[in-house]
């Protein structure tokens, strides 16, 4: 076997190796390689036998051809389908699929398209989360049960991952070869139906450009689809169907569209009941009927940007997972081992006549046995409606509460809470409170916002402060307030700051700071349009739709829901100087600045009155309370005499400017002087504020 590649030394090495193999009884740990390929002992022996009659090149080539034949046999067309796909029909036979409820119509339409002689390719079109994949799983279950036309009663639905067809195809022609193997596999099986989720990905999939001559997946499949040699079920969204599939007319006519709409709330509850058992078994959590209904109702109310049943199922799954984590499963092995140890200790105690100790050990054994018994097949936790509310709060940040007795009392008292913060504006507070009570109690009509109000009046009387307090009272923090200063929206291009720019303009892809995007991210918000009279007329035109229909379409075509927002517009224009003006006077005055159709959209137009000195007495107390909150961080208490309060009111009172001068006086005379005193006496624990010689003085105690 002497040649350019091997010499006699290699022959001797090979003979010794074969002799060692024969003499050794332990062959399981030995591996043999030829040309980088792992081979068995028999293949190696065959190779050595051929070595005397053939050259090394011929022997290596023969071995490679044999290996390729073996690989081809192992990856036959039928097996190729199994390698890259899931057999949904087989999973249905094995009971691995969730039950599909309320989709009989869509399943029937899909089955009818599949039973056609040609162009038997249904495509399920619907928004994300409505259950397109579930319909295909329902069809697989219907095939197993025999509730389908005779033409497809023996079909096997194979779910194909498109990425698996592209994996490893680094050389030209490899992708096309995979597709041909797929098509041949379907032809040879004669009963396979391929299911492509996100089927829009087949457009251009595998193509490397027009100059390379490499075709994409859709181009390769078109002839087989039109002749009925291969049957495909597709699933995609409305947008992807319009932007990808419909642009290819030849591909579109080979598919038959099956529309999949969002199920109703009632159907979604039935869907949750159908899958409840699997979730209970998985999480070991009991899920009563009222919890299922709460999942649907609260997800509809607080997660409007997603669709049923997906969002309701997610809420149910997250809640059960959270409860399961709070009640971890008992470690059965460790517990049984501990019981065995305690039994041994008990016997020793009895032998030593330590009966009290033995009794204590027996009680511990009984406790562990009870835990084992309760955890063996039993649900360790029971979900409640309150748990669903907590899940919604974690997902959205909205403090969700149910209409229980405490919440009813809270709604009743909302006006008194607001009046304690907004001084001297009882009429405005009461009007806003009525709108909120009506909405939270569920007596609103249509899809309009919770409330829309126009606050008019002089500066510094509490218009903006009422909006802030509403955000805190309803949604828990000031971050729920979206404040827009209309002086920034006075030019003709300001509308792009509201809804974003349209296609073809700069900034089309970046709408992150627009009003519509802020509301989409935080659907429960108080929207404040400050000094609305300064806004461009186009802004007011947009607000007509928001206040009437409760939605707004942004520059990218997305419909944003404003149903759960409170819209407040403020204006300094046309307010009266008197304190006893009637509603008709305000409306008549506002018509000088705003169009009648704009004013007519508001739930209420409220005049904020000038503040008198009695109102400032309550306001100064609120401002001093804010100072005390700051001092609490330093561990300092504060006492302010009545003379000091009267002095602050006298210095800060201005009927035309409202409460803002008083805020400045408190900042300059109280905060600044306490700061100066603290810097000189860092160990101070208490400060007293009083008037001496018509001047505010600060005295402290350590």
From Swiss-Prot:
Region Disordered: list its residue ranges: 46-80
Annotated GO molecular function terms are:
ATP binding; ATP hydrolysis activity
Biased composition range(s): Polar residues:
46-55
Which keywords, in A-to-Z order, does the entry hold? ATP-binding, Chaperone, Nucleotide-binding
Segments for region (I)? 81-332
Per UniProt, the ranges with Low complexity bias are 56-74
- Where are the stretches annotated II? 383-575
Q: Could you tell me which InterPro entries the record lists for this protein?
A: AAA+_ATPase, ATPase_AAA_core, Clp_ATPase_C, ClpA/B, ClpA/ClpB_AAA_lid, ClpA_ClpB, P-loop_NTPase
Keyword field contains NADP: no
Q: Which GO terms describe its cellular component?
A: cytoplasm
Q: Where is the UVR domain?
A: 336-371
A Pfam family in this protein? Answer: AAA
Binding-site residues for ATP, renumbered to this chain: 126-133, 457-464
Query: Biological process GO terms, please?
Result: cellular response to heat
Q: Which family does it belong to?
A: Belongs to the ClpA/ClpB family. ClpL subfamily.
Q: What is this protein called?
A: ATP-dependent Clp protease ATP-binding subunit ClpL
Question: Which organism encodes this protein?
Answer: Staphylococcus aureus (strain bovine RF122 / ET3-1)
Tell me the classification of the organism that encodes this protein: Bacteria, Bacillati, Bacillota, Bacilli, Bacillales
The gene for this chain is: clpL
């Amino acid at each position: 076997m002497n040649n350019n590649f091997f010499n006699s030394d290699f022959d001797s090495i090979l003979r010794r190796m074969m002799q060692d193999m024969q003499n050794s009884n332990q062959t399981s740990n030995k591996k043999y390689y030829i040309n980088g390929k792992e081979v068995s002992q028999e293949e190696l022996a065959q190779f050595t036998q051929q070595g005397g009659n053939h050259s090394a090149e011929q022997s290596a080539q023969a071995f490679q051809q044999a290996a390729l034949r073996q690989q081809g046999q192992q990856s036959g067309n039928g097996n190729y389908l199994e390698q890259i796909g899931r057999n949904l029909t087989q999973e249905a036979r094995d009971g691995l699929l969730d039950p599909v409820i309320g989709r009989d119509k869509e399943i029937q339409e899909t089955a009818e398209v599949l039973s056609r002689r040609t162009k038997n390719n249904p495509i399920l079109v619907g928004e994300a989360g409505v259950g397109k994949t579930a319909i295909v799983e329902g069809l697989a279950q219907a095939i197993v049960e025999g509730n389908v036309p005779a033409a497809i009663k023996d079909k096997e639905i194979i779910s194909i991952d498109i990425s698996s067809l592209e994996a490893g195809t680094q050389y030209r022609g490899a992708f096309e070869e995979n597709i041909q193997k797929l098509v041949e596999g379907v032809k040879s099986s004669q009963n396979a139906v391929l299911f492509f989720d996100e089927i829009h990905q087949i457009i251009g999939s595998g193509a490397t450009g027009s100059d390379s001559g490499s075709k994409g997946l859709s181009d390769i499949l078109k002839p087989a689809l039109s002749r009925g040699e291969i049957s495909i079920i597709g699933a995609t969204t409305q947008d992807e169907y319009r932007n990808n599939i419909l642009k290819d007319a030849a591909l579109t006519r080979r598919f038959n569209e099956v529309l999949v709409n969002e199920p109703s709330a009632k159907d979604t509850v039935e869907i949750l009941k159908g899958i409840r058992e699997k979730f209970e078994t998985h999480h070991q959590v009991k899920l009563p009927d009222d919890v299922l209904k709460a999942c649907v109702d609260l997800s509809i109310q607080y997660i409007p940007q997603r669709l049923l049943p997906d969002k309701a199922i997610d809420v149910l799954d997250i809640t059960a997972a959270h409860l399961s984590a709070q009640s971890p499963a008992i470690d059965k092995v460790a517990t049984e081992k501990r019981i065995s140890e305690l039994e041994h200790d008990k016997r020793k105690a009895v032998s030593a006549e330590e009966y009290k100790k033995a009794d204590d050990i027996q009680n511990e054994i009984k406790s562990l046995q009870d835990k084992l018994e309760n955890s063996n097949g039993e649900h360790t936790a029971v979900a409640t409606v309150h748990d669903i509310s907590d899940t919604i709060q974690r997902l959205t940040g909205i403090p969700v509460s149910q209409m229980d007795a405490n919440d009813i009392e809270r709604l009743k008292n909302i006006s008194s809470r607001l009046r304690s913060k907004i001084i001297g504006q009882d009429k405005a507070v009461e009007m806003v409170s009525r709108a909120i009570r009506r909405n939270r109690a569920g007596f609103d009509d249509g899809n309009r916002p919770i409330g829309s109000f126009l606050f008019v009046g002089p500066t510094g009387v509490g218009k903006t402060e009422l909006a802030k307090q509403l955000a805190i009272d309803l949604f828990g923090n000031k971050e729920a307030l979206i404040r827009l200063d209309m002086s920034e929206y006075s030019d003709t291009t300001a509308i792009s700051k509201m809804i974003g720019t349209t296609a073809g303009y700069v900034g089309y892809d970046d709408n992150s700071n627009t009003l519509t995007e802020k509301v989409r991210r935080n659907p429960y918000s108080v929207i404040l349009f400050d000094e609305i009279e300064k806004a461009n007329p186009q802004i007011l035109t947009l607000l007509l739709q928001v206040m009437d229909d409760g939605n707004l379409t942004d520059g990218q075509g997305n419909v944003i829901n404003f149903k759960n927002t409170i819209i407040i517009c403020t204006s300094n224009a046309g307010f009266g100087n008197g304190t006893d003006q009637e509603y008709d006077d305000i409306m008549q005055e506002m018509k000088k600045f705003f169009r009648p159709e704009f004013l007519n959209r508001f739930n209420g137009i409220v005049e904020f009155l000038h503040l008198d000195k009695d109102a400032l007495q309550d306001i100064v107390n609120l401002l001093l309370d804010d100072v005390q909150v700051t001092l609490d961080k330093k561990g300092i208490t504060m006492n302010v005499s009545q003379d000091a309060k009267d002095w602050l009111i006298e210095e800060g009172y201005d009927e035309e400017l409202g409460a803002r001068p008083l805020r400045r006086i408190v900042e300059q005379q109280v905060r600044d002087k306490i700061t100066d005193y603290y810097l000189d006496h860092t160990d101070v624990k208490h400060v007293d504020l009083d008037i001496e010689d018509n001047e505010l003085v600060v005295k402290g105690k350590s």
